[in-house]
Amino acid sequence: TADQVAYKKQLEADEKKLDAEIASITAKIKAEEASGVTPSNRYDGGTFKWPTTSTRITSPYGDTSDRTSPHKGVDIGAVRAGVSGDPVYAAYDGKVVIAHRQSEYYSTAGNYVMIYHGNGLYTRYLHLDSLNVSVGAQVTKGQKLGVMGNTGNSFGAHLHFDVMLDDGKTRQYVNPMPYFNK
């Protein structure tokens, strides 16, 4: 349908903007590390905290049942189906590198936060109703980032949570579940 074509074009445009922004962030981090600035974060292989109070996965990593490409993360439905407001927590210690409101940048992701945990590891928290953090903030595992919502391209209150690895040369989304089960 025309709506699906328009959505796919918007998603592709958002992905290109995001790729450019992440490349810029990664280059800045690598330059700081190369200049001798001690990174404030070094992911040490520890176990992640589950990012919200609900454990109801509504779309798993890699799912293709209702999309044209594999799902890059997991969707976690609200405790009360369709009702925004569940707290969203940092899965691990890190630095907030993106804290966007829907109107500012990516319409498909809605309000979202991205955290750099060190060693090329990032987590993203999409479709938030509101944000409690801003770019540059150091966050700790379990710290509240905002609340679950229904912003962007979303069909009900949920959290899209994903894990991305970026070594400055290649970027890939990976299954987040093993980070919780170490």
Predicted regions mapped to residue ranges:
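Short glycine/threonine/proline-enriched tight-turn/helix- or strand-capping micro-motif at secondary-structure
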Residues: T38-N41, R56-Y92
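Proline-centered structural pivot motif
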Residues: K49-S54, T58, Q172-M177
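Conserved, short, structured surface segments that act as functional micro-motifs
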Residues: S107-N119, A137-K182
